[in-house]
Amino acid sequence: MSKEKFERKKPHINVGTIGHVDHGKTTLTAALTKVLAEAHGGDARAFDQIDNAPEERARGITIATAHVEYESESRHYAHVDCPGHADYVKNMITGAAQMDGSILVVSAADGPMPQTREHILLARQVGVPAIVVFLNKADMVDDAELLELVEMEVRELLSDYDFDGDNIPVVTGSALKALEGDDSEMGRPAIIKLVEAMDAHIPQPERPVDGDFLMPIEDVFSISGRGTVVTGRVERGVIKVGEEVEIVGITDTRKTTCTGVEMFRKLLDQGEAGDNIGALLRGIKRDDVERGQVLCKPKSITPHTHFEAEVYVLSKDEGGRHTPFFNGYRPQFYFRTTDVTGTVTLPEGTEMVMPGDNVKMTVQLIAPIAMEDGLRFAIREGGRTVGAGVVSKILD
């Protein structure tokens, strides 16, 4: 049987459910697929299909993630749901499933709980642009004032982490009732309302091709009589022949002009996001440029050595360290295409970090890397991955 062609009629958005264990994330995921399959076509997925999520490997880390899709009036959503708390932490830090927005699920019967807070913090640290809230299990709360109180608590918690708590949409309902086909206000209409809030509140992400040109350099060749060629996959934006570009990272930033673009041995006028290209650079010697630098639009990205990061440390079972590490730990940080040694400073009050933990840390690299908030990296020891992280704040 041939795969049916994916028709891209509607803009595509990546979302995911976050929130405390047993607050109803997976039930809501199932309800979204069911209610929207009835409204706009598509497949309904049962709770147990989603809950038995297959394990995937992302950057050497095993993560259990369920992927479902559904459509609203105006959008196509790809939605991730994780069975366990550890899977969420890993997923958000590695960016294995990039989220354009998150649906925070809070049980109206319990209110915000420790993982509610932790997931909101992670969403802030890894740069999730927007959150909408589903106040679930509202059928179990008889008191309208109590519902209002829980909503206020959630809004305050979001504001604590620099989300717009006052204006974030909060939809109240029961995912289970919706899944059972209940048409009362708490049931299916609440799911429709949630999706309308997602359509309105989660912004359309910029397409990679619309960003500022950036290409991590993977290899460097010199072609006699023509000059130096750097190769790599264009991460975002477009590079046209004749345009000025900068080489950023490791050493001092240099400016040059791209005098040729080739792909599959053919000469092109331009290369764009997703293309694997070779770019010919004017006046650059083979030794002036190296793997680990980036080619980019001038002034669009700057080199840095000092940053804060949110990091997940692999457990022993995942092939990580068998022992904890301490302040002053000096592993390699693998950014895009290369390793750079760095020194770790742990937060005050944190003596050590155990395999399987996630931790906020400050890192000082021995050489600068073209960096921006949200950049992902791996932590390695002798070529073996022992952690994964994301830059949450550039310090200098």
Curated annotation (Swiss-Prot):
Keyword Metal-binding among UniProt keywords: yes
Localization of this protein: Cytoplasm
Pfam family for this entry, one: GTP_EFTU
Domain of life: Bacteria
Segments for region (G1): 19-26
Assembly and interaction partners: Monomer.
Protein name, per record: Elongation factor Tu 2
Species, as recorded: Halorhodospira halophila (strain DSM 244 / SL1) (Ectothiorhodospira halophila (strain DSM 244 / SL1))
Gene that this sequence comes from: tuf2
